[in-house]
């Protein structure tokens, strides 16, 4: 048995996914819990600490955890210490989550935007070059966007670069979770697709939605909205890969 590991956590608006990798970067264990259930009492740090303690007790009694890496669908400070805003999860805004978890668990914790972690994996898995500009557009609960320049994520002065899901759409009036009106993820996101499914296709399983209804105008407009958002960034950055 390998005696060291790294724990990776993906905190989403729907689920929290936790995995452990061994010294060969191979996934050893994986669990998924409900974000809504975990954070229902509003005490984010303590609730997540409890989830992690249970995971550590179950899988890591005989190994040394070198680090916990957490991906969050949030805007983070440029030093990646503070969560600035999480539109789709209440109670996280302003938290120094990494510091609080380190104090509770005694294990080093790093925070990063979830989409940047996704792009790191895609870059590794698809053997993408570090040279030039690479972008990733990820449709989850919201719209995630990673911008990498010469192998490093673009954070911007305040850490909020690349918030593609919160670009205002012309004529948009829908209320976004961030507090603004007409953000792109109000029209092109996972939660918008769920909303459309419930309104127009209540009897169709989500997994079969595009198989059975791909020619419907409602879904075509949804796909066009995603394409519009992605194309805007492509035209601005002229990336080497997407």
Language-model regions, residue ranges each:
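ATP-binding/phosphotransfer module of carbohydrate and carboxylate kinases, centering on a glycine-rich
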Residues: 1-67, 76-82, 99-107, 123-131, ...
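Phosphate-binding/catalytic loop of phosphoryl-transfer enzymes
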Residues: 67-69, 75-179, 183-184
């Amino acid at each position: 048995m390998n005696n060291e590991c790294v724990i990776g956590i993906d905190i989403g608006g729907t689920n929290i996914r936790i995995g452990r990798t061994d010294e060969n970067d191979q996934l050893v264990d994986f669990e998924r819990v409900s974000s809504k259930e975990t954070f229902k009492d509003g005490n984010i740090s303590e609730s997540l600490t409890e989830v992690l303690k249970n995971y550590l007790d179950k899988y890591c009694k005989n190994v040394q955890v070198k680090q916990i890496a957490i991906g969050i669908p949030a805007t983070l400070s440029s030093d990646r210490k503070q969560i600035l805003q999480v539109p789709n999860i209440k109670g996280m805004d302003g938290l120094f989550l990494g510091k609080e978890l380190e104090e509770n668990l005694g294990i080093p914790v790093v925070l990063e935007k979830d989409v940047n972690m996704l792009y790191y994996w895609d870059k590794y898995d698809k053997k993408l070059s570090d040279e030039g500009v690479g972008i990733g557009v990820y449709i989850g609960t919201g719209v995630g966007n990673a911008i990498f320049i010469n192998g490093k994520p673009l954070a911007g002065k305040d850490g909020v670069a690349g918030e593609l899901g919160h670009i205002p759409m012309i004529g948009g009036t829908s209320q976004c979770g961030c507090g603004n009106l007409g953000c792109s993820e109000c029209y092109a996101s996972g939660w918008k697709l769920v909303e459309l499914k419930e309104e127009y296709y209540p009897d169709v399983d989500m997994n079969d939605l595009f198989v059975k209804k791909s020619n419907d105008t409602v879904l075509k407009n949804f796909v066009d909205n995603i394409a519009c958002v992605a194309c805007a960034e492509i035209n601005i950055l002229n990336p080497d890969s997407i």
